[in-house]
Each structure stands twice: as C-alpha cells, then as structure tokens.
Design a protein with these regions (language model features):
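Extreme N-terminal leader/targeting segments of oxidoreductases
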Residues: 1-37, 55, 507-518
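Glycine-rich FAD pyrophosphate-binding loop
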Residues: 54-79
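Helical element adjacent to the flavin cofactor pocket in flavoenzyme catalytic cores
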Residues: 228-290, 294, 298
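Active-site-proximal substrate-binding core of FAD-dependent oxidoreductases
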Residues: 484-518
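Mid-domain catalytic core of redox enzymes
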Residues: 2, 6-17, 33, 272-388, ...
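N-terminal Rossmann-like FAD-binding beta1-loop-alpha1 element of flavoenzymes
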Residues: 33-62
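Mobile amphipathic helical/loop "lid" adjacent to a hydrophobic cofactor/ligand pocket
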Residues: 8-10, 102-103, 107-108, 113-222, ...
C-alpha cells in the first residue's frame, strides 16, 4: 500500500493524516468464485479481517473460543449481591481520535460513532501531589508538547535547562520501521534517563503510558515509547482527546458488529476453539475443532500471544522452523488486574471519569463508570451508589487477595470519601494475555504475510510498519491481513488511515536528523 494525495472520506481533524490506498482490483468477488476463509479469533483484529472479507463477498467463518466476541474487550453478564444483572469486562479503554482504522470498523454499525462519548480530560496524578491535565494543552504539534511542558507543574525551568536536548531530538521525527532499527535495543527507562526528564514528569507523562503496554518501562523497548510520543504528541493533531463506549463493550460494539457480519452471510461460531490448522496440498488448510474438520481456501490467525503460540505448536505443517521459533518467542506481558467495585454511595462530584495515577503502590488508574457508561449510570441512579474501577498493570508479585486489598486502600487514599462507603459487591479480572514488547524483540515479531500465500496473521503482537499501537494496531493488522488475501485474488481491499509517518514539518524533520549527525 502506498500513501496517496487523492481525496478520501476524512477520519479525523488532522489534515496531515495519511491515507493508504489498497492495491487496485474489483469491488467484490463475482458470484460463484467466492473463496472460503476461516478467521480464527474474534477480537478487534479478527473482527476487522472478517468484516472486510465478508463485505467483499468471501464466505467467512469466524471462530472464537469464548462465548462472546470482542477478545480482550469482551464482556460477560454477572449478578451482584443486590440482585442486579450487570456486565463485567476489562473496563476502561480510551478510543483515541487518531485510532482511525478502529473507528472505521466501528462505523460499520454506528456511522456517526454515536455509541462513543467523549471524556473531557486525561488527568494524571502523582502520589507526591502534582497533577497534570491535558484539557488546556493545544492539539496541534509541536505546540501540544510545548504547551504540556509550559502548563505542567512537573516541569520547572531548572528541569528544562538540565534536560539533554540532543538526546530528545529523536522524538521530533519518528518513522516506522526506522525507529525500531535505532531504538529497539534500548529500554524506555534508559532513553528517558538519557534525556534527563524530571523524575516527576518521567512518572506522570511517560510511565503511565508505557504501562498501557502492560510493561515495566525498564523492560519495554524505547522504540515503542517514541512511537507513543509520536502518535499522541508530535505526530498527530488529534491530541489526547478520546471517547469511551456509552454502554458496556458487548452492547455498544461487538453484538452490533456480530449481527452485521451475519447479515453479510458470515458464519460466526463463538464458543468454538480451534485445535489445529493443517495445510492442504494445492493450497488452503484444514481447520479442526472439537466437532470436526473443515477445509478453507484461506486462513487468518488473529489470536493473542498465548493462543497463537499454542495453535502453531499444535499445527506442525505451518511455516518454517525459523518462523515457528519466532512465534514461540512472542512474550506475554505480566498479569494485570481490573477491580470493579459497586459502592453504596457516590464519589465526590468533582472526581473525573478517569484519573491516571503514579506512585500509588501499583495502582495505575481509577475510573468512575457511572460518569460515562449507561448501565453503570442506571445502577447508580437506582441505588444511590457509584461504580468505581481500579487498574493495576504489570503486577509481578503479591498474592491476588493482597493486591486487590491494596488497590482498595489506595482508592481510599486518593478519594477519601470512599472510606466510609459500603462495598455492595466487587469483581476482579486477573489476566495475562497481552503482548510484551521487550528490548530487542522487533526483528522477531511475525509479519502479516507468511510464506503460505493463503495464511495471514493479525493482532497487536504482529509487526506493522505503520505508526499504530494497541487497539489501533489490532484493527490495522486485521485489515492488512484481509487486504493481502484480497489483493492476491484481484479484489480491492480497505483504505487505511494513519497519523503522519514522519515528523510533521521540515523543521521538525531537520531537528530530528541532528540526532543521527554525531
């Protein structure tokens, strides 16, 4: 795919966002020539691939081992101690405005994105008492980064004077994959230490984001950190504005998309884990589940790291020894905890819907769900209570009960009015299924295309040479996986959008080039 200047339906406000056109081809498959495609994994990546393939007329079967779609953003029904039926999920996720391809997927069933609601700010608070806000920060780079520095109490003039400006220059011109070639061998912590960011700013502005990768910044590749800075600060004028679903994930996002897929003729098989994928002579593969085997002309593997490792290990006919070793080398991030607590009284009206935290013994953020989610708001209105969610990423030690208790104690510390609140009920989600991007891992990440022309990969663990991350990487690789299969059959794929793939201006690019002129 190549960037084009031709007009396309805009996906955001940034006039420098780039559009990537797919290979030319027919609009869809002709009747009678539709290939059969198995998409294995019903998370964001799998849903993106399945949706595009079904729209182009392919005969799609979507396999998902869980009983609902959404992958790591799925939800399940549960009954509380007060008899209320509610949805439990992994909770707060920010749908940033520069997640163009993810938002494009959601527009299939919600053209105006009316089921997303904006949050006014992304406040960050350190245990030392300092708080940062992005509400008044300009959105256009480089004024966004400069505005954050000027407005932030964590940056003093002495701190700015002590910073190593030359070491920070690579932030001004982030390119993919070059950023990995230069910085994948360096940890995020080492890079920040080299820049000499103030320690409080280090914690608030960077550690909070690096832990969004569910990783300790001492282990995370600095390339991922630079990419984050590009996506949110210096590469995009969308800024740190984001939306959240106004109902639980299943109702707002995945059930409508599942219905859409079925209307397109796709066979959606939830509660159906795949055991093996074995190549067939002449192309395609046989997909085996507990109920038997089915032959397909093409396959998309859109799985989390553990499931991908397991399926490839059980399917000895896939790939080369080196490719299989690379799959086996994909690491999973440390466990994380989402605690959702239903309280008998509201939190203070001044509390934000979301608060990022640092220095609070492992507590990474607090969400007040009844500020933005309809189901939680209705429960709070009916009971007079509130629904609060606590996240802890990269949990490496401690008994689960102790960690859960510790998060509640930190909530009491940060929001003292909760100390006297009665806990009506609580749910705790412990998971360890997100990819880890440690130092030096980029070269071994699997690509979308494989040596089998009928097999593609998708997911946020898959290498993507575009400036995307997290949910947007999942959606983008899902579309790329489908595009590759469609292009091989002469059918046009999905138009993709991305934040600029280099520094936004000649000045920024020239300054960034100084970092290599040593």
């Amino acid at each position: 795919m190549t960037a084009q200047a031709r007009p396309a339906a805009r996906r955001g406000r940034d006039r420098k966002a780039e559009v990537l056109m797919p290979a030319p081809g027919r609009d869809r498959f002709e009747p009678g020539e539709e290939p059969s495609v198995a998409v294995i994994g019903g998370g964001i990546a799998g849903l993106a691939a399945a949706t595009l393939l079904a729209e182009r007329g392919a005969r799609v079967t979507l396999y998902e081992r869980e009983h609902s779609l959404g992958g790591r953003l799925a939800g399940r029904r549960t009954r509380l101690a007060d008899g209320s039926d509610v949805t439990m999920s992994r909770g707060f996720h920010a749908f940033f405005r520069q997640y163009y391809n993810l938002r494009g997927l959601l527009r299939r069933t919600d053209p105006g994105l009316d089921r997303l609601t904006p949050l006014a700010d992304y406040p960050l608070r350190h245990s030392g008492g300092l708080t940062d806000s992005f509400a008044r920060v300009p959105r256009t780079p480089p004024f966004s980064a400069l505005g954050f520095v000027v407005l932030s109490p964590t940056f003093g003039w002495r701190d700015l004077a002590a910073m190593n400006a030359r070491a920070a220059l690579p932030l001004l011109d982030v390119r993919v994959p070059e950023v990995y070639e230069r910085f994948d061998h360096v940890s995020a912590t080492r890079f920040l230490d080299g820049v000499n960011f103030p320690q409080t700013a280090h914690h608030l502005a960077f550690e909070v984001f690096s832990r969004s990768f569910f990783a300790d910044p001492a282990e995370l590749s600095a390339a991922e950190l630079l990419l984050m800075f590009h996506i949110y600060f210096l590469g995009s004028s969308e800024g740190l504005l984001f939306d959240v679903p106004d109902e639980p994930f299943p109702q707002a996002l995945w059930e409508p998309l599942g219905d859409y897929l079925q209307r397109l003729g796709a066979d959606v098989r939830t509660g159906t884990p795949v055991d093996t994928v074995e190549p067939r002579e002449g192309g395609g593969a046989e997909v085996r589940t507990g109920s038997g085997a089915t032959a397909y002309e093409a396959v998309v593997l859109a799985l989390d790291p553990g499931a991908l490792r397991q399926l490839v290990a059980a399917s000895p006919g896939l790939g080369t020894d080196a490719w299989r070793a690379d799959i086996d080398a994909i690491r999973t991030a440390p466990p994380f905890l989402v605690s959702r607590i239903w309280l008998d009284r509201p939190v203070g009206p001044e509390r934000p819907a979301f608060l990022g935290t640092s220095g609070y013994d492992g507590l990474d953020n607090i969400s007040v769900l009844d500020r933005y989610e309809g189901e939680a708001r209705r429960w709070a209105a009916r009971t007079g209570g509130s629904v609060v969610e606590l996240h802890a990423y990269a949990v490496t030690d401690g008994r689960p009960e102790d960690v859960q208790r510790g998060l509640l104690e930190r909530l009491h510390e940060i929001y003292p009015e909760t100390r006297d609140a009665k806990v009506i009920d609580a749910r705790h989600e412990w998971r360890a299924d997100c990819p880890l991007f440690p130092v030096g891992s980029y070269d071994r990440r699997p690509r979308v295309r494989t040596l089998h022309p009928w097999l593609t990969l998708a997911g946020d663990a898959v290498r993507c040479d575009l400036p995307v991350a997290l949910m947007e990487r999942a959606a983008t690789t899902g579309f790329l996986a489908a595009n590759a299969l469609l292009a091989a059959r002469g059918v046009r794929g999905q138009v993709l959008w991305t934040v600029p793939r280099a520094g936004r201006s000649p000045v920024l690019r020239a300054l960034g080039a100084l970092a290599t002129a040593r």
